[in-house]
């Protein structure tokens, strides 16, 4: 088991080597005295919404993503990435609704609010129902497993004594 883990770890490190700038975030001793761009690299943003996603702001992987530094200006990437983070969070929370409303069309906003009201009155769609049923089945299986474990523990206590 340990050997499999070691081999897998080595294979992943060989396949995906860590970036050149792999160092502690807030360590003042590891940072160079002068930054070539005059900017500090920003810290990773951890958004936990169901699963953990790391969205990195800044130019940590600049060498691996672009061949030349003049392809995209760095200042225009921050607002785009911030907007992407915000939209991703809203999509994962289910608060966006109709994505087309972001174009500034106010008629779509009115239609979207009417659609939300109508949707709240309707029964849940099949996908929601499927996940609800799956959640209930998993809870029942967990309860059954706990009951079996308790029964097994009682038998062991009877056999070995208290």
Curated annotation (Swiss-Prot):
GO cellular component term of the entry, any: extracellular region
Cellular localisation: Secreted
Keyword Signal set for record: yes
Superkingdom per UniProt: Eukaryota
InterPro entries noted in UniProt: Corticotropin-releasing_fac_CS (IPR018446), CRF (IPR000187), Urocortin_CRF (IPR003620)
Main location: secreted
PROSITE patterns the UniProt entry points to: CRF
GO molecular function: hormone activity
Keywords for the protein's UniProt record, in alphabetical order: Amidation, Cleavage on pair of basic residues, Hormone, Secreted, Signal
UniProt entry tagged with the keyword Signal: yes
Residues recorded as bearing Phenylalanine amide in the entry: 160
Extent of the signal sequence: 1-24
PANTHER family: CORTICOLIBERIN, CORTICOLIBERIN/UROCORTIN
Family to which the UniProt record says this protein belongs: Belongs to the sauvagine/corticotropin-releasing factor/urotensin I family.
Role description: This hormone from hypothalamus regulates the release of corticotropin from pituitary gland.
Record's protein name: Corticoliberin-1
Organism name: Catostomus commersonii
UniProt lineage: Eukaryota, Metazoa, Chordata, Craniata, Vertebrata
